[in-house]
Amino acid sequence: MSEENQPNYTISQENWSLHRKGYDDQQRHQEKVQEAIKNNLPDLVTEESIVMSNGKDVVKIPIRSLDEYKIRYNYDKNKHVGQGNGDSKVGDVVARDGSGGQKQKGPGKGQGAGDAAGEDYYEAEVSILELEQAFFKELELPNLKRKEIDENRIEHIEFNDIRKTGLWGNIDKKRTMISAYKRNAMRGKASFHPIHQEDLKFRTWNEVLKPDSKAVVLAMMDTSGSMGIWEKYMARSFFFWMTRFLRTKYETVDIEFIAHHTEAKVVTEEEFFSKGESGGTICSSVYKKALELIDNKYSPDRYNIYPFHFSDGDNLTSDNARCVKLVEELMKKCNMFGYGEVNQYNRHSTLMSAYKNIKDENFRYYILKQKADVFHAMKSFFKEESGERMA
C-alpha cells in the first residue's frame, strides 16, 4: 500500500471492563459511607454542621468510623522480619501493636499535650434527606386520634407499579436496561443494545387518599441563666430534628414555639433557635402559656396536642408543686406530654424529682447526658406504636 493510501488512524482493542473499575470502587465506597452513617446515626444527628445548617440540602459531616485507606508507617521502633511460618490463613491478623501491654503515649486529649499522631477521619458530603430517611423511618406521633369535627383527607401519590406502556417522562431506565440485557443475553450476545419496544418499562402511580387529623406541637424551652451553651445546644438540636420530622411526615401539623425563664412568651422559630436570654427559672410560667394557647387557638376537640418541654431541671423549688399540677392539667387536654432534661453530670434535679411521681402513661421523660441522647430521646418520644396510623 502506498504512503498516500495509508490510513491516518489506528484501530486498537482495549479491555473496557478496566474502565469500570473506578465506578465500581466508587459505588463500594458510597455503600460503606451509607453503612457508616446508619451505624453512627446517634452521633451524627448532633453534628454542629447539621444543626446550624438551617436545613441546607448538603452538609459535610465527619465519619470517624470510616478509614481512608493509605500506607502507614509502623511507629513501633522494634525490628521486624517479613517471613511467616506458613500457617497463615485468609483473615488472620498479621500485625499487632508491639507494645506488649505497656502504656503508650498518644495524641493530646483534654488537658496536656500528647506526642502521637492524631486520629484521621473521613469527611463526607451527606444530604439532609439521606439522614432524614434513616432517622425518621420508625418515628410517628404517638396516640394520634381522628377528631370528630375534622374530616381532612390527604391525597398522596405513590409510584408503586411498573408497566410496559406509559409517559416517556416516567420511563424506568434501570429496569429497561436490565430487560434489554436479559433478552440480548438469551440470544447469545450479552449487551444493553439494541433496546426493543418490548424492553421498555414505565413507572406508574396510584392516588392514595389518607385520613388526616390535625395536630399541634408546643415546643417549650428553658432559656434561663442556668441553661448553659451546651444545654441550649442539646435542646435546640432536639427541636431542630423534631420540626424537620413533623414537616416531613405530616402535612397538617402546627408548631408553636415558647421560650421561658421566669416568664414565658410565644416567639418566632428564628428567635427560638437563635436568641439567648438569662434570668431565673419558673417553669410553671411556660405551662400556663401552653394552656392559654390551647384555650384560645387549639381546641382538644379539633386538635391532637403534644407539648414538649426541655430544661436543665433547675427550677425554683417552691414552684415544683405548681408545675406538677399544671402538667396534670395539660395531660387532660393532650395526647402526650414530653419532658426532656439536659443533665450532663447527673446532678440533683428539683424538677425531675417532682415529675418522677407522675404515673400517667401519657407522660414521657428522657434525661440527656451526651450528644447521642438527642437521637435516643427522639426515638423515645416518637416511637412507633401498634394500631392504626394516621399520617
From Swiss-Prot:
Residue numbers spanned by region Disordered: 1-31, 80-117
Record's compositionally biased regions (Gly residues): 98-115
Q: Which family does it belong to?
A: Belongs to the UPF0229 family.
Q: Name one Pfam family in it.
A: DUF444
What's the protein called, per UniProt? UPF0229 protein BcerKBAB4_0466
Q: Where is the composition biased (Polar residues)?
A: 1-16
Q: Where is the composition biased (Basic and acidic residues)?
A: 21-31
Per its UniProt record, what InterPro entries does this chain match? Spore_YhbH, UPF0229
Disulfide links within the chain: none
State the organism of origin. Bacillus mycoides (strain KBAB4)
